[in-house]
């Protein structure tokens, strides 16, 4: 546990020193989600209808922006090789990096999304559902993304390949996350979508760290 916290703290300190990387993803999310109300106009019914899809797609793409850097810096300076030689299990170190990525790229979106949701005339209950789906869904995005980030380590044009690998795997999260918000906005029960998102999160937590750690080991060998 001490090693896990050390990895998280180290990654967060590095992010604080490179604030522009985090701000770029947040700025992208805010700009993309704010352009739709400006382009569509004051049609509240239409804005409520498109809000779940727009907000979730923007969150997905914003998360994707920071994935390439999850392991890249440590790979380039040799830190990953040193971590692999440490007595701590690689899966623990990879988990720390995934958590740090979510804190930096996912958690700010959870905080910002309700504010953006007001532009789409979402009611309070829909905003609560939006927060809940993002809390369940964004960790899944970071977990799945870690596999792509590990598989593309040291690969030329890795960012393009990463997108091609990861985006199809993001589709279930997008469907269930946006579907829950839409169901709530039209007065339907969103509990089924929450259950499916929770199942995806549990499955990802159980499998992905081991897959990512194996991919990292292959990349550094």
Identify the role of each PLM range.
Residues 19-41, 56-59, 165, 169-176, ...:
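Hydrophobic alpha-helical transmembrane segments of multi-pass membrane transport/permease proteins
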Residues 205-221:
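Junction motif at the cytosolic side of a transmembrane helix
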Residues 64-84:
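Transmembrane helix boundary and interhelical loop/hinge segments in multi-pass membrane proteins
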Residues 51-67:
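Long, hydrophobic alpha-helical segments
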Residues 128, 135-167, 217-221:
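A structural motif at transmembrane helix-loop-helix junctions in multipass membrane proteins
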């Amino acid at each position: 546990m001490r090693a896990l916290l050390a990895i998280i703290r180290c990654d967060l300190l590095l992010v604080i020193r490179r604030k522009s990387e985090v701000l770029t993803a947040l700025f992208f999310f805010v700009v993309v989600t704010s352009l739709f109300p400006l382009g569509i106009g004051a049609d509240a019914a239409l804005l409520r209808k498109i809000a779940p899809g727009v907000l979730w797609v923007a969150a997905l793409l914003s998360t994707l922006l920071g994935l390439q850097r999850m392991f890249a810096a440590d790979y380039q300076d040799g830190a990953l090789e040193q971590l692999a030689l440490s007595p701590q299990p690689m899966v623990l170190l990879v988990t720390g990096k995934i958590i740090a990525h979510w804190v930096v790229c996912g958690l700010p979106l959870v905080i910002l999304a309700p504010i953006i949701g007001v532009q789409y005339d979402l009611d309070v209950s829909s905003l609560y559902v939006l927060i809940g789906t993002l809390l369940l869904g964004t960790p899944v995005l970071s977990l799945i993304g870690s596999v792509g980030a590990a598989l593309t380590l040291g690969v030329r044009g890795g960012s393009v390949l990463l997108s091609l690998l990861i985006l199809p795997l993001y589709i279930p999260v997008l469907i269930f996350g946006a579907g829950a918000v839409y169901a709530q906005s039209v007065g339907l029960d969103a509990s089924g979508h929450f259950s499916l998102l929770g199942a995806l999160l549990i499955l990802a937590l159980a499998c992905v760290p081991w897959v990512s750690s194996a991919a990292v080991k292959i990349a550094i060998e």
